[in-house]
C-alpha cells in the first residue's frame, strides 16, 4: 500500500490502537495531505470509551507511535458527530469556533464564526486547515471573524 493514501493512516491506527482494530472505536472520516497533515474523525460504539482518548493513548503513546511512522506529518484526531454544526466545529480544531451557521443544508454550505484571534488558525497555513476540514466533513466552509458578519 502506498504511504500517501488515507488507508495507510487507518492501517497504522489499527496496528497501534486496539479499540480501532476490535471495532469499539470507528474511523468515520479521514482527510489527508500526505507529508503535511491528516485529520481523522472517530466515534465510539461504547459510551464508556472516549474515542479521541483511545487514539491518543496514555501520555500520548499511541499517537506518538503513529507520528513516528509518518515522519513530521501532523495528525489531528477529533470526535465525529452526526450534527453537522458540531462536526464542522470539531473539524476546524485546533481553532476555537464560536458558531456554525448552516447556510444551505442541501448544498452543504456553512459559515463559521471565530474570534478574530483564531482566524488564521482556523484557515491554516495556505488554507490547509479549512481545506482539510471541508474535505473531512463534506461541507463548503466559509470562515469569518465574529465582527465581520
Which residues does each predicted region cover?
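RNA-contacting regions in translation and RNA-metabolism proteins
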Residues: 1-149
Amino acid at each position: 500500500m502506498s504511504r500517501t493514501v488515507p488507508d495507510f493512516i487507518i492501517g497504522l491506527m489499527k496496528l497501534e490502537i486496539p479499540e480501532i482494530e476490535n471495532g469499539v472505536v470507528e474511523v468515520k472520516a479521514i482527510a489527508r495531505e500526505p507529508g503535511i497533515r491528516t485529520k481523522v474523525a472517530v466515534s465510539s460504539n461504547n459510551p464508556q470509551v472516549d474515542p479521541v482518548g483511545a487514539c491518543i493513548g496514555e501520555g500520548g503513546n499511541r499517537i506518538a507511535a503513529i507520528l513516528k511512522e509518518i515522519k513530521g506529518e501532523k495528525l489531528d484526531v477529533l470526535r465525529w458527530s452526526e450534527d453537522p454544526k458540531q462536526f464542522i466545529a470539531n473539524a476546524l480544531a485546533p481553532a476555537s469556533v464560536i458558531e456554525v451557521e448552516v447556510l444551505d443544508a442541501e448544498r452543504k454550505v456553512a459559515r463559521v464564526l471565530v474570534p478574530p484571534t483564531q482566524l488564521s488558525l482556523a484557515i491554516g497555513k495556505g488554507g490547509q486547515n479549512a481545506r482539510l476540514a471541508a474535505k473531512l466533513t463534506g461541507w463548503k466552509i466559509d470562515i469569518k471573524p465574529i465582527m465581520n458578519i
